């Protein structure tokens, strides 16, 4: 794995290399998180840094902030959202951060073989490696940026998730794994998802993981 930081504010990012398809690596992720959060509390830091708590960290809020503050969080949330309609599961009543039903790769996830015209063999997985290439999208959302760079021109025009590199990659992943039905790869919906990709290769250059949607299309 790797560590990097915003040195000026003392914010560390922990990036272990783990395969979230494997139960053993999911257990490692939780162990790493618990140990890291214990260190954060020991040194009086914040487990979210400049980020929100979200699904990944809300589970630990009561331990981090104490029961009194956790009760105040609940009071505020209940005052503004008594029916739990707005972004539920954040800050209070959070699921476990390692709940497998929240993962992109749920238990039993698999991809069948699929004939391809291009060589994807530098990536692992089924469909000659296309699976691995598609799964390089880790949902970081850089393709949704609106300032600077090129990626992703179609999303910048429509503002629709399906017209972003991430939206297209997730559609391909769901189709390859059979979650959109047996004919999804050749469906009208797939064609509609891909039609506004202008093959600019901005994603290959600017995506942090180098997702090449023009080639996949």
Q: Regions from the language model: what does each represent?
A:
Residues 103-217:
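Ferredoxin-type iron-sulfur electron-transfer modules in oxidoreductases and energy-metabolism complexes
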Residues 1-139, 159-161, 167, 196:
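Conserved glycine-rich FAD pyrophosphate-binding loop
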């Amino acid at each position: 794995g790797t560590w990097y930081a915003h040195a000026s504010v003392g914010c560390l990012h922990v990036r272990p290399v783990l395969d979230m398809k494997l139960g053993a690596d999911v257990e490692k992720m939780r162990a790493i998180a618990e140990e890291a959060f214990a260190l954060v509390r020991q040194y009086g830091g914040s487990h979210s840094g400049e980020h929100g708590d979200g699904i990944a960290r809300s589970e630990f809020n009561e331990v981090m902030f104490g029961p009194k503050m956790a009760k105040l969080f609940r009071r505020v949330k209940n005052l503004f959202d008594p029916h739990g309609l707005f972004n539920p599961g954040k800050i209070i009543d959070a699921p476990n951060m390692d709940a497998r039903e929240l993962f992109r790769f749920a238990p039993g996830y698999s991809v069948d073989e699929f004939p391809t015209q291009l060589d994807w063999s530098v990536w692992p997985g089924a469909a000659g490696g296309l699976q691995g290439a598609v799964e390089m999208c880790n949902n970081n959302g850089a393709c949704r940026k609106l300032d600077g760079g090129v990626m992703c021109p179609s999303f910048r025009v429509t503002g629709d998730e399906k017209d972003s590199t991430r939206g297209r990659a997730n559609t391909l992943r769901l189709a390859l794994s059979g979650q959109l039905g047996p004919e999804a790869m050749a469906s009208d919906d797939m064609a509609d998802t891909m039609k506004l990709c202008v093959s600019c290769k901005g994603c290959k250059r600017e995506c942090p993981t180098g997702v090449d949607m023009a080639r996949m299309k």
